[in-house]
Amino acid sequence: MGQCLESVKWADEIIVVDSGSTDATVEICKRYTDRITVTDWPGFGPQKNRALAMATGDWVLSIDADEEVTPGLAQEIREVLQAPLAQGYTLTRLSSYCGRFMRHSGWWPDPVLRLFQRGAGSFTPARVHERVELEGSVGALQQTLLHHSFRSLDQVLQKVNHYSHEGALALHAQGRRASLATAIGHGLWSFIRTYLLQRGFLDGREGFILAVSNAEGTYYRYLKLMYLQDKAPRA
């Protein structure tokens, strides 16, 4: 968290919304801002909209705790906001996986809309895979937003469980249904897409590990959905 906040300390205001962390996150945040709100966890989209509602500046830069604005990107943002030509801008995100920055596997290039005029955009209410809905034109910045997404295998396993849970809840809310066969099929397809079609094999061993963890996450998402649709114990 400190690495993230250090990279944006040049901002006019820093707003942090914490969903009840039990480590030193809040204490770290206090070194950079007093605009800290501790609340429940309604999902990624609703949580980011809570933070957005607290903003007072003309422009909003939304980043997650595991992301870092590079000095080059910070300079590019400051320059473009002197005379903006669009209502929002995508950032070029480069993500790491267990110590390797991934240039394939469907992770690159990864443009994400994170810089936008306050009042012109908001986040979709999705629990996972939220995105900004913007009224107006979108430009593109060239410098890099670093995403330290998975620092270790332990974190991979934790996030597989978390995201599969959130994904299952989202699918269940949409009325989607699943079976063991669909869970297996979606998981297998996820591996094929990541490792072969998106050339994950060019990312070395981390490309293979990512393809397997993607398959696991997809498999468990639909498996959890299967049990959500019928919580009664099975013989």
Positions of the model-derived regions?
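A conserved acidic beta->alpha catalytic loop
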Residues: S7, D18-E27, D64
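Acidic helix N-cap motif at the loop->helix transition within catalytic regions
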Residues: G2, D23-Y32, G72-L73
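Alpha/beta-hydrolase active-site loop signature
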Residues: S21, P42-G43, E67
